[in-house]
């Protein structure tokens, strides 16, 4: 069972002045299942483990650099439960060992099925077929975003977080912002920094949390998983100034956009803004691999 962490998650002040920005270090929650991934899995896997059948199996979905895939694989290794990843992109099948995230997931015991992008988009059909093939399996959607994940995310909110005017998180599949906006206190403004181009994202989040008490800000900076030189530069400068590592797909882009809108006057003077560091630092290795192959500057963080 995933235990409730004994660690009190630190909240670090990043900037002062007319608008104060803080970062809640959810990335420190677990060395392998970090950040929001821990809380998204918390109820999903614990409820499943209360009564698994004779053939327990956890199946989930993701792309080549998915933090969720990495976390589920680590969970399987820790609890000795088989895991399977349904991976977007059949072209990866013959050389997935060249991809840091998938290589690490495989070494943690996860087995893969690679599907083409057209079939991958039909996830509801895929999930139904998998449930028929593996009737005792726990099947978790892409990014871990379902109603049990939303319930788990409530633990990211504590007595400490109630004093902030704004709560900010990166948004991929929408589970984290659904939980944060659902369980935030009434006075708080919730902002999601979207790192994907998805016109249906707001509707998906609303379906998960039951309301639309949040705002979305575009922070994809060229597209999901696309890493510009500006993003690399920001992450390196942030590391030098605050000694806090950021990943290039989620939290790095969120913090870069957060700093931008702060300078543009988005927040009223006197605002207290808290952003959630949702982990994903395993992605730095794979990102640097791609950047090196293109002879570009890399993320200079040694964890």
Regions found by a protein language model. Give the residues of each.
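PLP-dependent amino-acid enzyme catalytic core
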Residues: 1-303
